[in-house]
Amino acid sequence: MGRKRVVVLGAGGSIGKNSLEIIRRFPDRFELAGFSVHSNSGFAKTLLAEFTDAQFVSTKKKNSNLKHEIDEEAVRRLIEKSKADIVINGIAGSAGLKASVEVIKSGLDLALANKETIVEAGELIFQDAEKSGSTIIPVDSEHAAIFQLINAHKKGNIEKIIITASGGPFLNTPREKLSTIKLEDALKHPTWKMGGKISIDSASLANKALEVIEAVKLFSFPPEKIEVTVHPQSIIHSMVQCKNGEIFAQASPPDMKNPILNALSFPKMPESFLKPLDFSQIIKLEFMPPRTDDFPMLALGFEAAGKGGAYPIAFNVANEEAVDAFIKGKIGFTDLADITQEVLNSDWTMKPSSYEEVYDYENRARAIALARILDRVNGLQ
């Protein structure tokens, strides 16, 4: 088999740039068939000068500056023209769902880094993937680890999934200081280099909440059989506990290039270029329970996962809008969970049966979240 032709959606983001590094490092295995950026035309020109045969589109929707909107037709055009074998979806936020839908409809394999796709519309995505023949390979380090562990130990033998969390930059911050956290502090992740939104999600534990919901849907495990443990070193990416009580872990240095390379190489096991862990040296591994009282987003995520219906959609959109408001200085750090809770207080029991219904629920949740944010801006809360 020749080189895999790869399309990178969201090439200017953290996942996109790491994916491009993999393609550069292994020109005998992969070639860049196409890529998208949202609006960074300068970055696109630089890439086109380097990858002269690659197709390119901007996913920015005309006459719209909203981050949650993308040009689906542009994604469809890119997929058709690129003649790709696999697509990496590194688009951040709920906008990535529409891109995933286009990839799945095309029948191409999807290396999925956009967790919102599964959180909001996992059941619909899996149905369409079965019809089109697409394989969905998780790129998130935790879900990539679980994916490998389940393949190795068989789902029927597994009693519990254990997802690790770094604890973020405020792992040891006293509760009374959380309300005074500044944006620049929330962006300083201790172990991972990530984009702004996901860095803040990590700081609030919203990212881990989304990962719990994603794991419930991706691996068909109930939330009561999923546990989160704080592991500051980010060396163990996830674990599974088998029915005999034994626990198996996936361990590797905290570098997103590893799960990206694995996803692009699937179903083969690639030879990595990353330096493996050296157990001849002292390696410190710590585990502790998450501070759910101080960081309530994780508990809200478990609640949304357990209730099902459109609750995961409401959780994701509420958090997305709250994070955007925090970045713009409109609300404080502890408002992130309060706003999300207020949105979840509405009735979201109806399960969406189409993508259109998913988008309707998104719009409804977004309107409530924006109203709650405006209340705070106007000093009403």
UniProtKB/Swiss-Prot annotation:
User: What is catalysed by this protein?
Assistant: 2-C-methyl-D-erythritol 4-phosphate + NADP(+) = 1-deoxy-D-xylulose 5-phosphate + NADPH + H(+)
Superkingdom of the source species: Bacteria
The protein's required cofactors = Mg(2+); Mn(2+)
Stretches of the chain forming a coiled coil according to its record = none
Which residues take part in binding NADPH?
A: G13, S14, I15, N40, N114, E116, G195
Enzyme Commission number, as recorded: 1.1.1.267
GO BP terms in the entry: isopentenyl diphosphate biosynthetic process, methylerythritol 4-phosphate pathway involved in terpenoid biosynthetic process
Where 1-deoxy-D-xylulose 5-phosphate is bound, by residue? K115, S141, E142, S166, H189, S202, N207, K208, E211
Q: Which UniProt keywords apply?
A: Isoprene biosynthesis, Manganese, Metal-binding, NADP, Oxidoreductase
Q: What is this protein called?
A: 1-deoxy-D-xylulose 5-phosphate reductoisomerase
Species of the source: Treponema denticola (strain ATCC 35405 / DSM 14222 / CIP 103919 / JCM 8153 / KCTC 15104)
